[in-house]
Regions:
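Conserved nucleotide-sugar phosphate-binding/catalytic loop shared by glycosyltransferases and other
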Residues: 6-9, 28-71, 157
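Donor-nucleotide binding loops and adjacent catalytic segments primarily
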Residues: 19, 24, 34, 40-46, ...
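Acidic donor-binding loop of glycosyltransferase active sites
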Residues: 88-89, 251-266, 273-274
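An amphipathic, basic-hydrophobic alpha-helix
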Residues: 61-90, 108
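Short hydrophobic beta-strand element within catalytic cores of glycosyltransferases
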Residues: 258, 274-285
Length: 297
């Protein structure tokens, strides 16, 4: 049995797809997963075992660059030792700065490196590792920032979703349904924009028809204010926090308002739930915009 290591971390956009991949591989391979501290909060520890790694972001604090460069090289040697000790045959990177030391270590040890890119824009770490990778798995055939000379490495697949999603019934659009249910989720990084602007939009729409709102609150300090506004407008609402178990939110949803994360959009699309995507403006390489454009097409 092949030993596979999935390397992930950072935002939920990197981590959530890696857990879906883990689920699909674990019955045929021996699979391990490593993540950094930031990414670990998006991993359901009851379902997935993982090891914590500490990889510095080289450019986050420029004044620490010399120290971080030393730590980064140290990470490469630690990654080599980790792969040797675990007899790893294949490394799969889901992107993020913390994945590159393991990819480079695998290359040094002549192990296979597979890249997994769920976004419609090739991320920087995967871009750096592309040269010595075996294949890159992606959803979008027109992956942006992708060098043409590596086209032979590209493998296009349908979105890899959590197994729970496949067990849900697909949404049947019912225009005659009296009370619609709207899901508002700002993604793993939250969205203060949603707390303020989308809340006002919901209040305005509520003047014309009744509906139920399930809303992720990005900033707990906004909870009381939003609650008071909804109470005054007689809106039926439920507040939620970000959850790794997104499948629990989709039942009976008629419309979703969301950021442009690849995992969320692929789940909504699969379940035939109409959605309005508002991409995160600060997303690197504007990838959330292109994710949204991919599903718009």
């Amino acid at each position: 049995m092949k030993n596979i290591l999935i390397v992930t971390g950072g935002s939920g956009g990197h981590v959530v797809p890696s857990t879906s991949l883990f689920e699909h591989l674990k019955n045929k391979f021996s699979v391990k997963m490593v993540s950094d501290l930031r990414g670990s909060k998006y991993i359901n520890t009851e379902k997935f075992k993982y090891e914590l790694i500490d990889v510095p972001n080289l450019f986050l604090k420029p004044y620490l660059l010399p120290i971080n460069i030393f730590k980064y090289f140290l990470n490469i040697f630690q990654s080599i030792r980790f792969l040797k000790n675990n007899k790893t045959n294949i490394v799969i990177s889901t992107g993020g700065y913390m994945t590159f030391p393991f990819c480079l270590a695998a290359f040094i040890l002549q192990k296979k490196v597979f890249l997994f890119e769920p976004n419609s824009v090739l991320g920087r770490s995967n871009r750096f590792a592309l040269k010595f990778s075996t294949k890159i798995i992606c959803y979008d055939e027109n992956l942006r920032n992708f060098p043409i000379k590596y086209n032979s490495k590209k493998v296009i697949v349908k979105p890899i979703l959590k197994k729970e999603i496949y067990n849900l019934e697909k949404n049947i659009i019912n225009l005659k349904k009296e009370i619609k249910k709207i899901l508002i989720i700002g993604g793993s990084q939250g969205a203060s924009f949603f707390d303020e602007n989308i809340t006002e939009l919901i209040i305005e729409i509520s003047k014309k028809r009744n509906f139920e709102v399930i809303q992720q609150i990005s900033n707990i300090n906004n909870l009381s204010s939003i609650k008071n506004k909804y109470d005054k407008s007689n809106i039926n609402y439920k507040f939620i926090e970000f959850t790794n178990d997104s499948h629990e939110l989709y039942n009976g949803i008629d419309l979703a308002i969301t950021r442009g994360g690849a995992s969320t959009l692929s789940e909504l699309s699969f379940l035939n739930i109409p959605f309005i995507s508002i991409p995160l403006p600060s997303a690197r390489d504007n990838h959330q915009f292109y994710n949204s454009e991919f599903y718009y097409k």
